[in-house]
Amino acid sequence: MRQTTRRPATACWRPAAVVAAVLAGSSDAADPLRIDQLQLLGTHNSYHLAPDRFAMTILSSVAGSRVAPLDCSHRPLTDQLQAGRLRHFELDCYLDPEGRLFRDPLIIRLADADGADVPPFDPKGLLARPGIKLLHSPDLDVRTTNYTLHDALQEVKAWSDAHLEHVPIFFLLELKSDSLTTTRPLPWEGDAFATLEQEIAAVWPRERILAPADVRGDAATLRDAVAGRGWPPVDAHRGKAAFLLDNEGSVRDRYLAATTKERLLFVSVARDHPEAAWMKRNDPVATQAEIRRLVQDGFIVRTRADANGREARTNDTRRRELAIASGAQLISTDYPEPDPRLSRYHVALPDPPEPRHD
């Protein structure tokens, strides 16, 4: 049996309100706030900068209105943490062990050939260095606030070092190998997963990571731990980061096969899988009832308040409200603040994860 009571299955239950009460000093020390009782806002494609005007013109001439969702930019991660009080980030990761795959993208070459006036691209030459790179689509949608995974992790770590009382920060890592051009990204298999974990550990030491082993404890499986005593208390893991593998299917299965129980990333699997602790349910409209059941049973769920810019273009808040009401702990958005070109649409939670630090 769990040491704490199950959360009430009601639409008005607000995890963030519980956080605010604890921070205000009204918590019961015998029943500490658990990590799965948080509700945190984060961004989708958190590194993304919209293509420049020249690139949007080229892409629109080929794909028409399908490129509209690309016209979305995020602030630097530090600003998202500080001003936006966002606590989870999605990063698209490409292998690049030699530093040669993404340093000279087609769309930048076309702009140079045309003499187009575009913002500088990779002025420090970071893409020519070996290491995992962050971008949305090779050659085409390449602008980013962080060119490398190392720099993104280091930026968040620096903020964390200065604000060690923060609740755990979640990184959702999507391991990508797709391309629409002649660039051929490397597959995620074999030693690639060790490379990923080494890059993480080079920035975030093990004692600052909330890993599956920390949740599993002495239970036989991660699922047994979550279904039994539940996720650990927030206060035991302040100042830490947790890493979630966004991929499901074959990439996830290869990661599980290539790593041990001491792996650093949580994986999204079926609820009866031994490694079940979090699940990705991106559509809160279609899976509302399922999300509520998963949350009620102690699993962490990530869902999306909007997708492809549709909600922002029409100022449609239904999906946003359902995402919040579902109780999903990790809510992602492309619009933590309004885009004045589109509408007033944006996503904000009723209560912050912690007081402002500015």
PLM segments and residue spans:
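Bacterial N-terminal signal peptides that target proteins for export
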Residues: 3-16
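Bacterial N-terminal signal peptides
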Residues: 14-24
